[in-house]
Structure formats: C-alpha cells, structure tokens
C-alpha cells in the first residue's frame, strides 16, 4: 500500500499487475514493486517461473522509478541469479543512478525473501512525446462495444 508521502504513478497506467506486479513504494527516482508468481507463469511441470516474468517485473519497476508517461526502455543488462518458482513473492527495487539529458540509468534488484534472484541495469529514455506518436490510439480495455 502506498503511503501519503509517496508519488502517484504517471506511467504504464494500463499495465496488468497480475503479470508485472503491484507498486508498493514510489518515490522520486525509486520504486518497489511486488509480484506473486502463479501457475500460468510456469515454464515446466516443476513450477519453474519463466525468466521473462521476472524481467517484466524489473522493467516495470525501472519505468516507475522514472515515472514519466513517455519513458521507454532502450536497453538492459540482466543477470538471473537464482531460479524463481510458482508461489514465490518477488520484490523489485529500482533506483535511478544517473541522468544525462533524456537518458536515465536505473539499477534494479529483485529479491525473494531478501535473497537476490535478479540484478539488472536498465537504460531508459524519456521522449518528448509518446513513442507511438501523437495520433496513435488503441482501445486496450478489451471492451468490444
């Protein structure tokens, strides 16, 4: 739960928390996001969670650390340190380390019960307008009416 001293999210407003986590802390240049992994994330019958879900969690935390509606990911360097299994609660902690114009460097660590499972450096860019341009709009609500 966000406390009153924290910021409101300005980015990735339509994202589904089931797949990339729920923000638990959001401050200028910092974000923490929690993800409870579930069976539909499993890569095999033993419950190994596909690394893409952990990466998605880390990416979302990096975007929230920047917290601009026009932030995009340019590149990343990722290290998967330990396996994640169905039922694990993984928390991503993101901190903006540097800013050079529109380029932001964000360090992210994902932990399970305080044990690191992922580390990454994300190079993000804040663009002057949405990456799809000013005239592109899509109905992402799923409402066919």
Residue ranges and their predicted role:
Residues 1-3, 70, 84-86, 97-145:
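HotDog/MaoC-like acyl-thioester-processing domains
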Residues 1-40, 135-145:
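Non-catalytic linker/capping segments at the edges of enzyme domains
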Residues 18, 75, 103-105:
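Short coil/loop residues immediately preceding or within conserved phosphate-binding loops
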Residues 31-33, 76, 92, 106-108, ...:
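Hydrophobic residues positioned within well-ordered beta-strands of beta-sheet architectures
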Residues 35-37, 80, 126:
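Hydrophobic residues in beta-strands and at strand termini
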Residues 38-56:
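A conserved, well-ordered hydrophobic junction motif at loop->secondary-structure transitions
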Residues 60-91:
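Hydrophobic beta-strand-centered segment that forms part of the acyl-chain substrate-binding groove
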């Amino acid at each position: 739960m966000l406390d009153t001293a924290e910021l409101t999210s300005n980015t990735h407003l339509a994202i589904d928390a089931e797949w990339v986590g729920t923000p638990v802390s959001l401050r200028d240049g910092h974000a923490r996001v929690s993800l409870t992994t579930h069976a539909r994330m499993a890569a095999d019958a033993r419950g190994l969670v596909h690394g893409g879900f952990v990466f998605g969690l880390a990416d979302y935390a990096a975007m929230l650390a920047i917290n601009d509606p026009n932030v995009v990911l340019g590149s990343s360097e990722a290290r998967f340190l330990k396996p994640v299994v169905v039922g694990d609660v993984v928390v991503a902690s993101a901190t903006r380390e540097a800013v050079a114009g529109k380029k932001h460097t964000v360090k992210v660590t994902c932990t399970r019960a305080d044990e690191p499972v992922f580390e990454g450096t994300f190079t993000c860019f804040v663009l002057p307008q949405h990456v799809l341009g000013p005239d592109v709009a899509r109905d992402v609500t799923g409402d066919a009416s």
